Amino acid sequence: MRRFTVTLFLVFFLVAPAYPMTVEEAVQHALGHNPDLQALRLEEGTAKGLLEKARLLLINNPTIGGNISKKDKPEEEGGGAFTNYGFKLSQEFEVAGQRGSRIAVAENEFDRVKAGIKDRERVLISEVKDAFTKVLALKKKNGLTREIVQLKEELLGLTKIKFQAGDISGLDVNLAEVELSKAKRDLLLNEREYRESLFTLQGFLGLSPDRSFALEGDLPSEAPSLPDRAALQEAAYAKRPDARATVFEVEKTKAALKLARKEVIPNVTLSGFYDRDELRNVVGLEISIPFPIFDRKQAEKKEAHAKAEGARIKCDGQKKTIEREVEQAYSDLAAAIEELTLFKKEIIVKAAENLNLLNLAFKEGKVGFFEVRLAQKDTIEAQVAYIEAQTRTQLAVNAIEKTTGGSLK
């Protein structure tokens, strides 16, 4: 009884359960737990802090100063000592509208950072969907490879029986053994590739390798409809966050160039002071303006102009890049749809049924070993090609959604 209790404890508490997960759940988990995305989101707080600073009414803090001194009186004035002291309060003011330009720079930077975060989410969603698709495909290939191993084992058993009966030669038995060894090797390779794909998916999801989960879903069995190419281009320009980010960068550099030009105009410093000595009290105002003779922000203006021109060029290049990506994704989807339509699920099922009938005919001696071997090869190749066509179709759909920044559904 005690041993039974310990066994139950191990089953329920030490064996990690496999959590079911759909592709939608995987995407949501990645958006909430991916470490790279979490680190990138912190940049929004930095940009928000810079915006708050830019909105300050006065960018410079006031300055307060003071002085104190002691002085001896002449003997003819009675001797002794007296103390002089004074205070001065200064404030620097911008008079060329630099605050408005500074706010424009910070606002566009804040919007650019938010768009950059959205763009990283767009890319992450595509990466998760691609990894999810590859895991499903390898899982399906693993199942097929196990069936192939079982099929080869059955064929080897039949060949040994027929060899003992004198119906076939030893060469056929050797070929069957070689085919079985190759099938087992393929199974090991597929299982290793499947584990590696799971680790990749876990990395995108922010999960530790010891976290066990079971993927729910299947590869597409029917070809999706091909969307309109022009509509895809329009959707990409309108929805993609990286397109908006380049626009915000252009506006930011324009505002920065205006700010550099305004900073040539010197700031005005106003000061109020109070001085006291043994004879009088003095209260007054003081104004100071630096002369921009040597430093006229030449380097800052050149730097801002270069950045503005670079941002404009990058924005134009981004449009062409998006156009190429949409064209490539559209072509890949069209090719994948055409390939998938060549396969019908019913045909694949019938091919497997025909193979079973052929194996039965071989067992009864109606067909030879090489006919069965050739039929197995053709059926296996057709099933593998069908899985690969399904995989390419789903990856093409994922690419379309990535390039357009939306969903085809």
Model-derived regions: residue spans:
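Positively charged n-region of N-terminal signal peptides that target proteins for export
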Residues: 1-4
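Bacterial N-terminal signal peptides
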Residues: 7-16
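Periplasmic alpha-helical coiled-coil/stalk elements that build and connect Gram-negative outer-membrane
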Residues: 21, 117-235, 329-332, 336, ...
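Regulatory alphaC helix of protein kinase catalytic domains
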Residues: 21-27
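A small-residue-enriched
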Residues: 28-94, 207, 233-302, 309, ...
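Amphipathic alpha-helical coiled-coil segments
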Residues: 39-54, 120-147, 153-156, 161, ...
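Short, charged, amphipathic alpha-helical segments
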Residues: 104-107, 170-179, 369-377
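Metallo-beta-lactamase
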Residues: 190, 241-242, 389
